[in-house]
Regions:
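Soluble non-cytosolic domains of exported or imported proteins
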Residues: 10-18, 56-62, 158-162
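N-terminal propeptides
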Residues: 135-179
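...with weaker cross-activation on analogous glycine-rich loops/strands in unrelated enzymes
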Residues: 30-107
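Active-site signature of cysteine proteases
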Residues: 93-133
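N-terminal capping segments
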Residues: 1-29, 176
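A structural signal for well-ordered alpha-helical scaffolds and beta->alpha junctions
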Residues: 13, 17, 94, 117-118, ...
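Generic recognition of cysteine residues
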Residues: 16, 27, 37-39, 64, ...
Length: 179
């Protein structure tokens, strides 16, 4: 279910979009990556964003740091226009193979491998990284460091990474997680 901005996320909520937003905040990219806790609402923000954009064509080859949206009800017979159910961040691209870091993948942070234009792809959020090339971020990152951080913020094991623990504590202090 889509949830509005300003919504205090609960532990029982799906948290894939919240994860993408938390990574964007941690990397100082909230001005080019729409922040939201629901997939469809995040797509709406990409569609109306001043510099970043929504790409409906799931056959494009995204770049590391782009945001991929899924529709688990996709039949695989043509362009999918259903509601997005899940979201992650492209971590690497090799030919037509994508690796995507996802929060709420079996209730943890993991990496998924899939093909460009594969079944379940809904579309892509394309952050305007080019606007960051001459600017320093809140965390003094240049564009290359921002992309590196964005695509490496996940721990694929069962033990939470130090970053995940720090992010969780931050979210609790700021009231983002509401028990």
């Amino acid at each position: 279910k889509p949830l509005a901005r300003g919504y205090a996320v609960k532990y029982t909520d799906a948290w894939c979009a919240t994860f993408v937003s938390a990574v964007a905040i941690k990397c100082g990219l909230s001005d080019i990556m729409p922040l939201e806790c629901g997939c469809e609402a995040m797509i709406s923000l990409y569609r109306s964003h001043a510099v970043s954009r929504w790409e409906e064509d799931e056959s494009i080859t995204p770049q590391p740091g782009d945001v991929v949206f899924y529709d688990w009800q996709d039949s695989g017979s043509g362009d999918d226009r259903g509601a997005a159910d899940h979201v992650g961040i492209v971590s690497s691209v090799s030919g037509r193979v994508l690796k995507v870091i996802e929060g709420n993948f079996s209730n943890s942070v993991k990496e998924r491998t899939l093909e460009v234009n594969g079944k379940y792809l809904r579309g892509f959020g394309l952050p305007a990284y080019y606007t960051k090339t001459d600017n320093k971020e809140d965390f003094d990152m240049d564009i290359n460091e921002a992309r590196k951080q964005l695509t490496s913020c996940a721990d694929t094991g069962d033990t939470p990474s130090a970053w995940a623990e720090e992010a969780a504590e931050y979210c609790k202090r700021k009231g983002i997680f509401n028990g």
